[in-house]
Structure formats: structure tokens, C-alpha cells
Amino acid sequence: MKPSIVAKLEALHERHEEVQALLGDAQTIADQERFRALSREYAQLSDVSRCFTDWQQVQEDIETAQMMLDDPEMREMAQDELREAKEKSEQLEQQLQVLLLPKDPDDERNAFLEVRAGTGGDEAALFAGDLFRMYSRYAEARRWRVEIMSASEGEHGGYKEIIAKISGDGVYGRLKFESGGHRVQRVPATESQGRIHTSACTVAVMPELPDAELPDINPADLRIDTFRSSGAGGQHVNTTDSAIRITHLPTGIVVECQDERSQHKNKAKALSVLGARIHAAEMAKRQQAEASTRRNLLGSGDRSDRNRTYNFPQGRVTDHRINLTLYRLDEVMEGKLDMLIEPIIQEHQADQLAALSEQE
């Protein structure tokens, strides 16, 4: 391992020990905000520190085994130990490289999830409903909270469009690679001939930004319309114009919110989604510039980004970005998404490592 990387790891290990000491200090415990910030930092440094300690121990084992090679009686055992220690050292170095990769500051944030029915009419709306249920199950398993912000139901079930806020630890980091096109191949319930139809939905995942980081939106750039909400919401839901539609004139982005009975609450929710969408559009522009030189696994939420195909007759799901095919569609639709999410995160990390080695 390069001396510069070892020096960086030593500094992080020292900081980990320093933070551990601070967390036991009475003054720190009394200051709740500082205590929380240090607890987060401690958790972030723990894996690096533990892995680096293991690596240091293995270097000592290698040194000891090399010294034993000079002893004829110990040579054979020393050679075995040396081979094992070198293999372990390589594994730990790879782990440390991944742990040192630059973190996306948005990864720990809550996220807005949008699922939109694309081509395929009623069947696309039904599939949008299935996708939303799949993500809700995944969120439930991870103890995340799902709050529907806006929903437009399909005529025969499912959703033409649904927007939800998902809150919890590391939501955006886990879900961000879901953005893009999702295609389904199956026999619709309305199909009497048993023919397989292909429909599509688009998914967009955007980080929820704190107020201080939301893009500056000029009120003059907004057109705000009110209308009577439709759908679920109790007996009083249709009696007032509580639903809100906000159009951002410079970008043409439109956000509707009709989930709350209060117009004020709907407006606040719609503005937070609008801010996230504008931020996501700006991010997509930057990513397009980067993608011209390097492939980008992070979809734009556009239909042309084909992420996955869900083939029901064959029980197959394929992720086209990394050529991964699994015959476990039933489990995936029940929210067991880690088998698809983990490989793409690993592929993304491999791309980051390749980019770093090119820079060096």
C-alpha cells in the first residue's frame, strides 16, 4: 500500500480514537447537538479504523513469518503463514480502498420516490402500483417511513403517478440507482388470448434537501393553481380547493399535491418536491457531462434509461446496466431488493476505484 494512503489511514485511526475519548467527556454529553454529530462521525470512522488495525496486525504477521524463513525447521510452516497473511493483506487493502472512496453527501438523506406509468396504458399503471408496493415493502424491512405526497390513481387500479417521501437511515444511498426505466413483460389480467404485453414505468429518486440547500426559487417564476382533490382522504376531501399544482415556469416542472386537507400543508409539500426536482435536474446536467467520458450507473429517471426488465412468465428480472439476471422475481416483487441493489453499488465502487487509479 502506498505510504500516502497509509498516512491518511493513520490520521483517520487517530481521529477515531480522539472522537471515542470525546464521546466519554461530560461536556460533550451535555451538548446534545455536538454529541450527535460526534456519534455520527464515530460510526463513519469505525469501519476504516477496525479494518486498518487488522491490516497493521497482518503486516506484523508477514514480518514475523519472513524472519522464520531463515530457520530450516520452521521454514515450511512460515511459508504457509506468509502466503495466508499476504492473501489477507490484499483483501484488507481492497476493503480499505473502498472505505476511502469519496462519499456522496446526499447518501444519508431521506428521498423522494416518484413512480410514473409510461407506455402500456392500464397495464403500465398496474405495474406502477406493483413497483410502489415493492419499494414500500423494502422500506418496511429497513424500518424506513413512507409518506405519500401525491397520487394519481389508474382507472383500473395502480397509479398513473405516485410520489412518496421515504425517511430513514441512508435512504437515498440505497435507492438512488433505481432511477430510470423499468419494463414489465407479462400477460395482463384483461388479456383473454394469453398474449404477453410489454409495458414500462419510470422511477425517479431524489434526495430531500435541507432548507438551507434548496435551490433559490423566485416566487415570480411560479404559477400556483388550486383545485379540488380527488380520491382517498375522507368525506370532507372534496369540499374545498385544498389541492395545489405548482408550475416552475423556467423549467416547465409541474408538481401536484393533494394528500392533505390543508392547502397550506399541500403547498409546503409541493414546494419541497419542486426544490428536489430542480436540484435533480441540475445534477442530471452535471452527470451528463461526466458520462460523456465515463459510463454512469445513476439513471436520470428518464424512460430512455432502461434499468431493468421484469419478465413474469419466466420469473426473471434482468438489470441491463450490469448484465445481471436473477430467476427470483417473486422475491424481488415482495421487496427483497438487496440482491439487485448490492451488485450495482459494488459495480459503482469498482468504477470509482478505476477512476481514482486513472488519476494517480
From Swiss-Prot:
This is Peptide chain release factor RF1. PANTHER family: LD18447P. One of its GO terms (biological process) is translational termination. Methylated by PrmC. Methylation increases the termination efficiency of RF1. Its main location: cytoplasm. The modification N5-methylglutamine is found at residue 235. The gene is prfA. HAMAP family: Rel_fac_1. It comes from Escherichia coli (strain K12). SMART domains: PCRF. InterPro entries: PCRF, Pep_chain_release_fac_I, Pep_chain_release_fac_I_sf, Prokaryotic/Mito_RF, RF-1. SUPFAM superfamilies: Release factor. Gene3D superfamilies: 3.30.160.20, 3.30.70.1660, 6.10.140.1950. Keywords: Cytoplasm, Methylation, Protein biosynthesis. GO terms for molecular function: ribosome binding; translation release factor activity, codon specific. GO terms for cellular component: cytosol. It is found in: Cytoplasm. Peptide chain release factor 1 directs the termination of translation in response to the peptide chain termination codons UAG and UAA.
